[in-house]
Amino acid sequence: MLKVEERYTNAVPELQKFFNYGNIMQVPKLVKVVINTGVGEAVSNSKAMETAEADIVAIAGQHPVVTRAKRSVANFKLRAGMPIGLKVTLRGQRMYDFLNKLFFITLPRVRDFQGVPNTAFDERGNYTLGFKDHSVFPEIDFNKIEKPRGLEICIVTTANTPEEGKKLLELLGMPFSKD
């Protein structure tokens, strides 16, 4: 099985031919992968942020940045500046290692997995994938989970259209649904 990096070197000529690029620098490539999660219960339970951080470190292999509330919301007992989430940006080799794990280990572990939806592209060819439960990642011990936590994975590319981004991710091994 080829890794994502090796698949990219094989995909460059195919993308150049498919989209009729005149210059090899026009071929879309991966820029970064951003993993983020909201920890809303951190307002009332300070330990929730620590456990979420430990889970993100296990999944990404890198310490996350704490995201804070921009403004106060009285209904949620939230004040501006309070920690409400975590995010990690992966680039370079860590990005490729994470995508290998995501495409070939994690996604096949999802129950009743039929492929990722084709509709999650933005207008610039970036793809966002959401998980309702982070326990599908092999680094997370299912017995130690206090509460299932959702997270988002945003794959940022240099593609200009959703079609370019889809073709790039398809050639890299992203399992899209058939419909």
Curated annotation (Swiss-Prot):
Protein name as annotated: Large ribosomal subunit protein uL5
Keyword check for Electron transport: no
Entry function: This is one of the proteins that bind and probably mediate the attachment of the 5S RNA into the large ribosomal subunit, where it forms part of the central protuberance. In the 70S ribosome it contacts protein S13 of the 30S subunit (bridge B1b), connecting the 2 subunits; this bridge is implicated in subunit movement. Contacts the P site tRNA; the 5S rRNA and some of its associated proteins might help stabilize positioning of ribosome-bound tRNAs.
Molecular functions per Gene Ontology: rRNA binding; structural constituent of ribosome; tRNA binding
Recorded GO CC terms: ribonucleoprotein complex; ribosome
Swiss-Prot/TrEMBL GO biological process terms: translation
Alphabetical list of PANTHER family matching this protein: 60S RIBOSOMAL PROTEIN L11-RELATED
Subunit structure: Part of the 50S ribosomal subunit; part of the 5S rRNA/L5/L18/L25 subcomplex. Contacts the 5S rRNA and the P site tRNA. Forms a bridge to the 30S subunit in the 70S ribosome.
Record family assignment: Belongs to the universal ribosomal protein uL5 family.
Keywords per UniProt: Ribonucleoprotein, Ribosomal protein, RNA-binding, rRNA-binding, tRNA-binding
Protein's UniProt keywords contain tRNA-binding: yes
